[in-house]
Amino acid sequence: MTTMADGLEAQDSSKSAFMEFGQQQSHSQQSSPVMAAGHYPSLHCLHSGSHHHPQHQHDTNYSGSNSYSRSLAAYPYMSHSQHSPYLQSCNSNTTTQSRAEEPDQQKTTVIENGEIRFNGKGKKIRKPRTIYSSLQLQALNHRFQQTQYLALPERAELAASLGVTQTQVKIWFQNKRSKYKKLIKQGNNPLEIDQLAGTVALSPRSPAIPPVWDVSASKGVSMAPNSYMPGYSHWYSSPHQDTMQRSQMM
């Protein structure tokens, strides 16, 4: 009887030990999703959002943020990724590029005395040079011989008479004064040079040199009335005359 009682007690103890092991295993399985959610917060948030009611979404997100901070504490290299030199260089390049683009967008064009400037600073964009006619140059030189400096009313009157702007007259007089001073330093007489240049510019063509279209007339070559080439036909014999001469020689 004692042996049977001992066998029953051994079976009961083995059953109780097996049941305790099963309870511990089930408890570990229930705690493992919580640990997994602590290490992988994104999956836990997705799982909770898909299977739970929307009213519990705020609680799950808050728990997910806490678990995310804990995961960053567990992996410190992830928290220092934003301080990497590559990301810092990219951020610095973007900031410098945005700062460089700001002044270009704020630039405005300003026109001063016929010259275009950007914000009143920087390089000037020069307009093309003004080409004066011979009559305009003669009037400007004549007025420059009278006076090298013009008052505002005189400049306006001269510009209106020549059909140019006051700025063009002002610039022409400035350039003329600088050339005049250079010629004086070189020991030349600028007035004589101006008079010579004016006579050459306004003098008619020399009659000793015939024009190109009068060369044929000067040589006495006759031209046919309805042709543009001079009559050189007497230099060449026609093919009919060549055949007649050959038949006579035979």
From Swiss-Prot:
Tell where it localizes.
Nucleus
Q: Name the principal localization, coarsely classed.
A: nucleus
What keywords is this UniProt entry annotated with?
A: Developmental protein, DNA-binding, Homeobox, Nucleus
InterPro entries linked to this entry = Distal-less_Homeobox_TF (IPR050460), HD (IPR001356), HD_metazoa (IPR020479), Homeobox_CS (IPR017970), Homeodomain-like_sf (IPR009057), HTH_motif (IPR000047)
Polar residues composition-biased segments? 84-98
Q: Which GO terms describe its molecular function?
A: DNA-binding transcription factor activity, RNA polymerase II-specific; RNA polymerase II cis-regulatory region sequence-specific DNA binding
Q: What does the similarity note say?
A: Belongs to the distal-less homeobox family.
User: Could you identify this protein by its name?
Assistant: Homeobox protein DLL-1
Q: Which organism is it from?
A: Xenopus laevis
Lineage of the native species?
Eukaryota, Metazoa, Chordata, Craniata, Vertebrata
Q: What's the encoding gene here? A: dll1
